Structure formats: structure tokens, C-alpha cells
């Protein structure tokens, strides 16, 4: 593809970004309806017996050379909704002869873990857990180590995203993308200049019934703990008790917990204030009809998260799984992921193919002067008091 044509293609894709964790919209079906039909079937169906397929694949600019790949002709993925570029999936299937494709959806890391604990091992090849859940998956024997000789494009990952606490030896996961949790605002309705989590809680009663919140405990605990000046990973009973008061004060004003299509009530002004991720909201900002939408990285601090690609234990199609991991980090392919999902790539080589308007978008690629506000997550999801508060909060929504 000519450089000029590629840039035009990427800019066109940028105008139609989709939510990181939102279900497929009917308008997006097009020639991809066959893929969606496969999604509805899921891995609960008896796997087909695909014939092996091989492909050397075209060498992407900046990507590492790899030997011709022999795949099983099938790949079963368990992932967040709407979290891969449709074009990239079509390209992967065509290049590697993947005729049997399954894409099942989970709405939270907790559900992914629960399904694997319930016996789903061996049903799927690949998943995309958030980084802090990787240790629990390793401990539960739910992952297979990645053979990096089959994923040479791992070398394109920025060093600051390697050998981190959740995988200190880089054995189990490949960074997918990263983003933030923040405040989404329809400014033509919300007239206050909300720049902190503290202000978010203060104005919430005024917009009662018009607040959308992601259905993710780690993200939700971020808001009260940061508003109070604490670590978002706190398990201190006193600090969590204060956070509980803020959350229970917020709960009656929340329209819904929604991790999948939270941008839609924001689009329709059914919700005008949100505790959300960047993806999807970025789409509203780019739409002239909803250009008053704003995404704020709170000044009192917030969560930055990273999602990762993992190969699940006993994968039915291990060669296809490795081929996919290498494919998805080819620079031009990875650039399309960033454009499609509106989340930052850890692959520096991909930035050459990302339009300047996205590279310079501070809600996607967080500037160096804002990054100190961000705090990474630890695995505190099983802390009994946090679990208790979360269940109490969920049961009080809209009440």
C-alpha cells in the first residue's frame, strides 16, 4: 500500500473508532457478518477439524523476520467485546488460512477467571486479561508460556512495558495496549468544570440518574480512593470505609453499570457524566453531533491499566495462537489496532503509521507531564472488604 493511501486509510478509520469494550453495532456488520455468526456460536460447540495451513506472511516494515508458519487453520479467542480491528481479523484469517474462527466475549476480568476456574481450559487459544490478573491466571495454571522464538515482534515492545511485576521474566504475556480510567462529561449539560474525582462526587447529586459507571471494581474504587488522597490499591480498612461512604452516596444517582456500551447513553444524553475508559468516548469527541463531550484525566490521580495477550493452557491451536501474537504486533497492523480502539500501543514501531492527530491526543497517548498522576493496579481484587463494598455498591445502584 502506498504511504499516501495508507495515511488516508488510517485517517478514515480514525473517524470511526469503536469502544474498547462495547458490543458490535449493527451498522458495523458489513462483510463481517460471518465473523459475528461465529461469535454467537462460541467455543461451546464441538471444534471442527481444520486442515493445516501455512503462510510466510508479508514482512511488515520494522517487524522481525519469521520462518513460514504452519497453523492448524483455526483460532478460538476469548476477549473483551469489540476489541480488535475487524480489518486485522480479516487479514489474519486470509493470510494464515484460518477457516474456523471463534470469538467469545467476557465483560470483566472476574468473569474470565471464573469461567476458567469452571473448566473452560482447553476451549480457547487466546485471551486478553488486564495485566494485574496475569499472576492469578498463572497461579491457577490457566496459562501456557509463550514461545518467543515464534513471536519475534515482541522485540518491538517498548522496554518500559517489559519485565513488570505481573510477569517479571516476560514468560506469560504480550502487552496489548494501555489506557486510563477517567471522567466523561457532556459539557453542554454539565456546566461545572469537573477536573477531579472529588468534584465528580460533589456534582453527582445534581445529575442524578444520568451518571454511567463501568462495571469494573478496580476502576470504580479508583474514584473514591483518589478523591480521598489514597492509593487506588488500598486495602486499609479505615481508608476503604471512607471510600465506601463516597460510593454509597454515589450509587443512588447512577443510571447503570455498563462496561460494554457506556458511550451510547452518553451519546443520547441519557447519561451526561461518566466514570469510564477513553475508548468510545473518544468517538463521541470526534463526532460533530457530540463534540461537547470531554474526557478528563483527573488531577487528583487515576488508574492506568494495560491489557495483555496470553495463550491459555492446553490451547487447541497453539501454532495459530503464536502466529496471531506475532501478527498483531507487526507495526502497520498494530497501528490499526490503536486507531480502531483508541488506546495507546506499547509498540513504538507502530507509531510511524498512526496519524499525528491520534499521537497528539492526550486522552490516548498521555503526555509526560500528566503521567505522574497515574497509578498502576495491583491484584487486590480478592480483598474481602473490597469485595463486600463492591457488592453493596452494585446492589444499591439507582436506589
What are these regions (language model features)?
Residues 1-22, 29-38:
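N-terminal secretory signal peptides
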Residues 40-48:
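Bacterial lipoprotein signal-peptidase II cleavage site
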Residues 62-136:
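Early extracytoplasmic/lumenal segment of secretory-pathway proteins
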Residues 78, 83-86, 106-109, 123-124, ...:
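Extracytoplasmic ligand-binding site segments that recognize negatively charged/polar headgroups
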Residues 184-189, 225-229, 305-320, 336-337:
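A bilobed periplasmic-binding-protein/Venus flytrap-type ligand-binding module shared by bacterial periplasmic
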Residues 240-249, 289-315:
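Periplasmic-binding protein-like
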Residues 264, 368-399:
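Conserved C-terminal helix/tail region of periplasmic/extracytoplasmic solute-binding proteins
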Residues 312-373:
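Mature extracytoplasmic/periplasmic domains
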